[in-house]
Amino acid sequence: MKLGDLEFHILNDGTFRLDGGAMFGVIPRPMWSRVAPPDERNRIVMAMNSLLIRTGGKTILVETGAGDKWDDKRRDIYAFEGQPRLPEQLAARGVRPEDVDIVVNTHLHFDHCGWNTRRVDGRAVPMFPNARYVVQRRELEHAHNPSERDHASY
């Protein structure tokens, strides 16, 4: 989609599953389960989308999905599904990791910043080596010191 000198692409990094009750909180299950049917473990399907923006010679990526650094236990818990993954979707649009100028994370939950890094020789290194990463200061502080209630999201 184009809007003036802005070009937008919605990229999908697949889906994962989370507990429906945790997602909908005080909304009764009979209400939310009509629009988001849970599986046998009470998990609902959640999509992971990123937004690629090109403007003024800059390439901006908003959110980076869940990434690929998951152990078997968490793969089972979250039931990640879907192809192609974010790197392949970027490549299909002619974008290499080193072409990304800015990565914006609205917050740092695992399903929003997973591709911020990739593993090289057992170490996490920036996936987008030339990018400036942008996140709210308070969110960064909270991610480093999460509460008991939300520590699993980081």
What are the residue ranges of the model-derived segments?
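Short glycine-/acidic-enriched loop or helix-start segments at secondary-structure transitions
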Residues: G20, D71-D72, G114-W115, H144-N145
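Metallo-beta-lactamase
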Residues: M1-V95, D99-D111, M127-Y154
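Active-site flanking residues adjacent to catalytic metal/cofactor-binding acidic residues
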Residues: V62, T106, V135-Q136
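Metal-dependent catalytic neighborhoods of phosphoester/phosphodiester hydrolases
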Residues: C113-R123
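Surface-exposed, flexible loop/turn segments at secondary-structure boundaries
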Residues: F16, D111, E141
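Catalytic metal-binding/acid-base residues of hydrolase active sites
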Residues: G67, H109, E139
